């Protein structure tokens, strides 16, 4: 077996033979009912990256299709970048574009991530949290957009467990207890539904369904719902043979239990963006408990669980028609291709795609009755571009329900929208302040790119001022602007604004520059330096380095620790690492006016509110420092833990930064991390 032999002698971090991983990934792909080529590619997905096998060899052995899938997966894993942010953005872009060429590449990546999350326990806690956070931000929305709900739910629960293990265990125990207490009532309601449908001549399968742990946690955290109010909702699925029976069941449910007004949703007539279809109703059941029922056909149920992968099931059964999920995903993929062709860089691509990725939809109508699906918050201009690019480009006004309506006002589900056009009209720069769909943004930008330089500069200024909020360009000095221009190798502010307006620079990234975040890390670590800035006695010193565990800075009490290679590592006097055996000597600073820059690490607890991080960045910039790295973690009581690595000249400079940070509203605690004993 090629995969087994190729990975011979390789082991996972858990100590298991590496081959167990591709076998598990292939098993997940098989459970998704994909074709044999996808299963083969899953078994081989790490062969090109981790072994001497080449794409050409795989092509000869298994065919071009399998080799291309494996190569596509491998290329996603091989990308190397200067920063983690850059890596995440570019990897995401590559994955999305790979998906537009062959959806199986990303399905294998989803399966790969699923097994990695299942076996996360052997990694360090900080690495588990980082991988779990990335999974929640990228892979869970992706699985949802493709309609693969059981994968999305599992990834969410595994990520929740990795990021908040204690909360996970507490909530799991609560759910287990609640489930046992609910069992009798669940069986009673289920039996009442079955009897009612049998008496009505409707053949159906009925079972109770429960929310997974992460969804319960999110409802408690974000919507501030109490645990018992979430668990008191009794939810059931009813599966029938055809669409007519779905509506018959709905009628019987409303005869059995009292329906709650305005709580019926028809996703059969208007499916969700990922192809999901069902009838949903909320009623008042026995003893006054809330009862939710989701009604599906067998095909709808399969699409609800399998999403786009249900397409392969139907093909194997001899049906060639695409499912609703498949058709909608194909349209979505085509829209992603259009976005990629219109944007200037990876950051802009991701900013545009995010709005398309996990949307809450509204449904509006054209005057002829065609349904147009848009994300929540979409405006008439978004609607115009959804109908056709030419309609958007020549839009001058709109009527909603035959009445004038502002172009910038958000639409609501059920409205009939009529766009007024003028062949001499053109898109306005101001539209970019309120449109929400990627299609509208990219089409407007595409048109504006063809306009004169002056308009591009105006567009760039609008976008940058929006990104800088609550600041604007006028708040920054000529010297601050010059610093940003020099970092970007640009000669003037107009040139910078034009680059933003043309989409060649990201407004959000430039905004970070203005509040102290550089595109290129400055040379502030200075791991090696000339020993003339300090004295270390009585040692003979070769190379001298600053310890990265405690980050000593000019003015600190310091100790030299000599390594076997005659290199002296300078530590803070109170660093815990000094308890390890090494030849030590007191050291002192010689040159107080040293031009060497130092790196200090601060640990900050701040209220988790809008613009909290921006306030910190502004304080650092105002202190004539720059940010080298940042990590964040959510704490209890709506607090955010922020760890900053900043560039400083000496302890006085650091004290000034700390003083400014302590003056920020919402800051609870600030301390320096010196790895203290």
Curated annotation (Swiss-Prot):
Residues in HD domain copies: 18-117
Ranges for domain TGS: 360-421
Tagged with keyword Manganese: yes
GO biological process: guanosine tetraphosphate biosynthetic process; guanosine tetraphosphate metabolic process; response to starvation
GO molecular function: GTP diphosphokinase activity; guanosine-3',5'-bis(diphosphate) 3'-diphosphatase activity
Membership in a protein family: Belongs to the RelA/SpoT family.
Name listed for the protein in its UniProt record: Guanosine-3',5'-bis(diphosphate) 3'-pyrophosphohydrolase
């Amino acid at each position: 077996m090629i995969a087994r032999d190729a990975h011979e002698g390789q082991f996972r971090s858990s100590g298991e033979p590496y081959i167990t991983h591709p076998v598990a990934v292939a098993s997940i792909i098989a459970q998704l009912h994909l074709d044999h080529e996808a299963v083969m590619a899953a078994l081989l997905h790490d062969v090109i990256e981790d072994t001497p096998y080449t794409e050409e060899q795989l092509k000869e052995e298994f065919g071009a299709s399998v080799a291309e899938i494996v190569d596509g997966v491998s290329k996603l894993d091989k990308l190397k970048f200067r920063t983690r942010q850059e890596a995440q953005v570019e990897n995401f872009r590559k994955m999305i574009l790979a998906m537009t060429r062959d959806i199986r590449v990303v399905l294998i990546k989803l399966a790969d991530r699923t097994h990695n999350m299942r076996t996360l326990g052997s990694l360090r806690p900080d690495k588990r949290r980082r991988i779990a956070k990335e999974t929640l931000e990228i892979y869970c929305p992706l699985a949802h957009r493709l309609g693969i709900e059981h994968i999305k739910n599992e990834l969410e629960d595994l990520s929740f467990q990795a990021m908040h293990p204690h909360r996970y265990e507490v909530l799991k125990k609560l759910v287990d207890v609640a489930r046992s207490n609910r069992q009798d009532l669940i069986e009673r309601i289920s039996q009442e539904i079955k009897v009612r449908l049998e008496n009505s001549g409707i053949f159906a399968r009925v079972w109770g369904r429960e929310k997974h742990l992460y969804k319960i946690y999110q409802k408690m955290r974000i919507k501030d719902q109490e645990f018992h109010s979430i668990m008191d909702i009794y939810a059931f699925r009813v599966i029938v043979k055809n669409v007519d029976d779905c509506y018959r069941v709905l009628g019987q449910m409303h005869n059995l239990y009292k329906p709650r007004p305005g709580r019926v949703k028809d996703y059969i007539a208007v499916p969700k963006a990922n192809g999901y279809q069902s009838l949903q109703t909320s009623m008042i059941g026995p003893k006054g408990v809330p009862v939710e029922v989701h009604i599906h056909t067998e095909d709808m149920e399969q699409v609800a669980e399998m999403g786009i992968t249900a397409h392969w099931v139907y093909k194997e059964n001899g049906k060639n028609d695409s499912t609703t999920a498949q058709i909608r995903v194909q349209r979505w993929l085509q829209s992603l291709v259009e976005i990629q062709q219109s944007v200037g860089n990876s950051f802009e691509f991701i900013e545009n795609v995010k709005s398309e990725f996990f949307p809450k939809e509204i449904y509006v109508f054209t005057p002829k009755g065609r349904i147009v699906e848009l994300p929540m918050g979409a405006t008439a201009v978004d609607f115009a571009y959804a109908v056709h690019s030419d309609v958007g480009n020549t839009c001058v006004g709109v009527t909603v329900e035959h009445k004038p309506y502002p172009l910038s006002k958000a639409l609501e589900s059920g409205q009939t929208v009529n766009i007024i056009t003028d062949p001499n009209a053109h898109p306005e720069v101001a539209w970019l302040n309120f449109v929400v769909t990627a299609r509208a943004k990219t089409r407007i930008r595409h048109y504006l790119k063809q306009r004169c330089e002056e308009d591009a500069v105006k567009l760039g200024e609008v976008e940058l001022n929006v990104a800088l909020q609550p600041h604007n360009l006028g708040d920054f000095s000529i010297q601050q602007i010059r610093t940003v221009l020099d970092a970007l190798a640009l000669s003037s502010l107009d040139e910078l604004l034009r680059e933003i307006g043309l989409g060649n620079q990201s407004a959000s990234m430039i905004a970070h520059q203005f509040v102290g975040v550089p595109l290129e890390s400055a040379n502030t670590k200075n791991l090696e330096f000339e020993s003339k800035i300090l004295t270390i006695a009585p040692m003979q010193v070769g190379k001298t380095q600053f310890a990265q565990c405690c980050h000593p800075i000019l003015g600190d009490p310091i100790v030299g620790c000599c390594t076997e290679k005659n290199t002296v590592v300078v530590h803070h006097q109170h660093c815990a690492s000094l308890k390890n055996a090494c030849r030590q000597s007191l050291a002192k600073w010689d040159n107080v006016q040293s031009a060497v820059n130092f790196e200090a690490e601060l640990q900050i607890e701040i209220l988790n509110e809008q613009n909290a991080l921006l306030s910190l960045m502004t304080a650092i910039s105002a202190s004539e420092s720059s940010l080298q790295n940042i990590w964040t973690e959510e704490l209890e009581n709506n607090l955010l833990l922020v760890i900053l690595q900043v560039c400083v000249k000496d302890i006085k400079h650091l004290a000034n930064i700390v003083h400014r940070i302590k003056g920020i509203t919402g800051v609870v605690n600030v301390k320096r991390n010196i790895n203290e004993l």
